[in-house]
């Protein structure tokens, strides 16, 4: 809808690591993409706990992964033994 009115989009990605991957792909495909806002602490410290290949910004730019799907390599050890790990971060 924004594109139809010549308005830029600026996704904010403060959700989980899969949202970060989806937003990177959205920004790559959107002709009216302006900027993607993300949280340094999350992609630098939290997302690597869940994902093997978190795209790290280089000189302010993120390259969307070219792997199948959204390109996320979820760590298989998170699903072993049926144990869920919960960590309070705030």
Residue ranges, per PLM feature:
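Shared catalytic-loop signature of beta/alpha-barrel
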Residues: 1-61, 65
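C-terminal extensions of enzymes
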Residues: 50-90
